[in-house]
From Swiss-Prot:
Homotetramer. GO terms for biological process: malate metabolic process. One of its GO terms (molecular function) is oxaloacetate decarboxylase activity. Belongs to the malic enzymes family. This is NAD-dependent malic enzyme. InterPro entries: Aminoacid_DH-like_N_sf, Malic_enzyme_CS, Malic_N_dom, Malic_N_dom_sf, Malic_NAD-bd, Malic_OxRdtase, NAD(P)-bd_dom_sf, NAD_malic_enz_proteobac. It comes from Pseudomonas aeruginosa (strain UCBPP-PA14). NAD(+) binds at residues 155, 268, 417.
Length: 564
């Protein structure tokens, strides 16, 4: 516990209003003196409880819920009533509850957002209010916001356009910043940009709470986002802004436009890439191989897949390959087949990842012929197969067996969310590779039994990366998020892998260790920020102290009353 946490907190609120403030409410844990000082007598049951007793009651209530969506709603109700208790409950049951507060359950919560809505959290900034964004940001009661997660809800997980229902993603993401990375909830703000929706189910739903209008696009959309960004810079000039679940047509252009203007990153592109590279580095370390020796095939060539590919290329270059050599080891497959330079429908960010058709002459096929996944596996002979397609079953038995036929221990990463859209299940992959494959998934899966072996499955979850990045940026007071900082995060994650440190277990650490992993990543990110001149240089001791000082624990502080 930090020295700050030991000191009393001076609070200007009292009575029912204090009980209605999630950041300050202690519920039945207010002491006798606090109940007197803050006019709470008679507003709470007589018995004074510890946070341990409150947590035990909350967990017993949680276990009465019948479905995962019910559990999600229950946890969110606690969060909206008492944030300290909410995060204490998560701290004690993180592995069990992470799939409830975030993927996969949060996807259903987004779909049902208007039906399960209870109370306000975060900011809803709609296109008709575009001239009042500064006023909207001023209405936020948190003056010291350090991390904002923003979405326009156009590409929520693998579920597509969810309108304002996408707010569930920033709320869930920021919950993980706190639960995994120790960022105080007082420093976080979820935001949804309501630019309409093209989802007919929402437009025709009488309960839909968002702006009932088709999505704004083009110049109008870009101007609206820019109004928001400029207002954010005026309100919180040192904030870390995370873009979340923007469609690929907007995700990369927005990142490119603003990455040098304020401290921001896109978790779908850069966070996903960092955790994927960290996983790949861990697998290479465990096998005694170099990353630069691997050949990687992707299924799914959207912004997320291409972002991972670009970071793998950068990592290969750090091991001595030149850029052209590294790019020849990356094969991107989408619904049209292998991306090649003779295709006319490539997106801007796909061009650099397209293979030269002239180099594939031995593969057969004529100019313009599509090269399907199985043909790519047979000819490219990859050692790594990564799925970011959102299409269930694309990693067929034939594909996986072909992969295994030329690589004894391939790394297979079906990363699509939610579980219903995964390219293949771990059980299938391990059955088809005689238990030899290393597997990391995007959604959580239970350990797999293969013969007499019980094999743990690593969840290649961005939660291993983004909380540590946030903590490192805040502790170092970094003014940008760079590719070097993301690579430092990936390397730090790889060094925490059980198969690297112990020679056994999953490719990634257990979620129960994620808070310590986040601290290690924060140190690496902060040091890299200093090395690149994006943060003031300090000694290791000062940096470590800053990380510990910014690491929040869900514990109640004593309150003292003060006037406004």
């Amino acid at each position: 516990m930090t020295e700050t946490a030991k000191r009393p907190l001076y609070v200007p609120h009292a009575g029912p209003s204090l009980l209605e403030m999630p950041l300050l409410n202690k519920g039945s844990a207010f002491s006798t003196q606090e109940r007197i000082d803050f006019n709470l007598q008679g507003l709470l049951p007589h018995n004074i409880e510890t946070i341990e007793e409150q947590t035990e009651r909350a967990y017993s209530q949680y276990n009465l819920c019948n479905t995962d969506l019910d559990r999600h709603i229950f946890l969110r109700s606690i969060q909206d009533n008492n944030e300290t208790l909410f995060f204490r409950l998560l701290e004690e049951h993180l592995e069990e509850m992470m799939p409830i507060i975030y993927t996969p359950t949060v996807g259903q919560a987004c779909q049902e957002f208007s039906k399960i809505y209870r109370t306000h959290r975060g900011l809803f900034i709609s296109y008709p209010d575009r001239e009042r964004i500064d006023d909207i940001l001023r209405s936020a009661t948190k003056n010291n916001v350090k991390i904002v997660v923003v979405t326009d809800s156009e590409r929520i997980l693998g579920l597509g356009d969810q309108g304002i229902g996408g707010m569930g993603i920033p709320i869930g993401k920021l919950s993980l910043y706190t639960a995994c990375g120790g960022i105080s909830p007082a420093y976080t703000l979820p935001v949804v940009l309501d630019v309409g929706t093209n989802n007919p189910d929402l437009l025709n739903d009488p309960m839909y709470m968002g702006w009932r209008h088709e999505r704004v696009s083009g110049a109008q959309y870009e101007e609206f986002v820019d109004l928001f960004i400029q207002a954010i810079k005026r309100r919180w000039p040192n904030v870390l802004l995370q873009f979340e679940d923007f469609a690929q047509t907007n995700a990369m252009p927005l990142l490119e436009r603003y990455k040098d203007e304020l401290c921001c990153f896109n978790d779908d592109i850069q966070g996903t890439a960092a955790v994927a590279v960290g996983t790949l580095l861990a697998a290479c370390k465990a096998k005694g191989e170099k990353l630069s020796e691997q050949t990687v095939t992707f299924v799914g060539a959207g912004s997320a897949g291409c972002g991972i590919a670009e970071q793998i290329i950068a990592a290969m270059q750090l091991e001595g390959l030149d850029e052209a050599q590294a790019r020849r080891r990356i094969f991107m497959v989408d619904r049209w087949g292998l991306l090649t330079d003779d295709m006319s429908n490539l997106l801007d960010f796909q061009h650099r990842l397209a293979q030269k058709r002239a180099d594939l002459g031995a593969w057969g096929g004529q100019q313009g012929d599509d090269l399907a996944l199985l043909e790519v596996i047979r000819n490219a002979r990859p050692t790594v197969l990564i799925g970011v397609s959102g299409q269930r079953g694309l990693f067929s038995e034939e594909v996986i067996r072909e992969l295994h036929s030329h690589c004894k221990q391939p790394l297979v990463m079906p990363l699509s969310n939610p579980t219903s859209r995964v390219e293949a299940t771990p059980q299938e992959i391990l059955n088809w590779t005689d238990g030899q494959a290393l597997v990391a998934t995007g959604s959580p899966f239970q350990p797999v039994q293969v013969g007499d072996k019980r094999i743990p499955i690593a969840q290649c979850n961005n939660a291993y990366i983004f909380p540590g990045i946030g903590l490192g940026v805040i502790a170092a007071r970094a003014n940008r998020v760079t590719e070097g900082m993301l690579m430092a995060a990936a390397n730090a994650l790889a060094n925490c892998s059980p198969i690297v440190t112990r020679g056994e277990g999953a490719v990634l650490p257990a979620l129960g260790d994620i808070r310590e992993v986040s601290k290690r990543i924060a140190v690496a990110v902060a040091k890299q920020a200093q090395a690149e001149g994006k943060a003031l240089h300090t000694s290791d001791e000062v940096l470590n102290d800053a990380i510990e000082a910014n690491f929040w624990f869900p514990r109640y502080r004593a309150y003292r009353r003060t006037s406004f």
